[in-house]
Amino acid sequence: MHELSIAHNIVNIASAAAAEAGTEEISAVYLRIGALAGVVADALRFSFAIAAEGTPLANAELIIEEVPVTVFCPTCNTEVTLPNPRLFRCPHCGRPCGQIIHGRELELVALETP
């Protein structure tokens, strides 16, 4: 379960940011996770609660924005969101699309203080 190591890294980064900002508590952590990032959101939430114990994030809410897979279709010459991230074919023309624009993100976007 690599989500636990990801959760520990999030807690470490956020704790350092809190210390740098001079705040003692973080109330929310905002993440963006792409559909291809290989992270299970529920497992990350569970792991985050464990990793945050005894830290400035102990009571923080983990808010996750799930990012769909967006690819560039050279045939249509446009970016398209894939309805099924396992099929890399344009939903409009049916041609294969290999250039991933979005969907691999794993980003700490923002921290919120009380």
From Swiss-Prot:
Zinc is among the record's keywords: yes
Residues reported in the UniProt entry to bind Ni(2+): H2
Disulphide bridges, residue numbers: none
UniProt entry keywords in alphabetical sequence: Metal-binding, Nickel, Zinc
GO molecular function: nickel cation binding; zinc ion binding
Family recorded in the similarity comment: Belongs to the HypA/HybF family.
Protein's name according to its UniProt entry: Hydrogenase maturation factor HypA
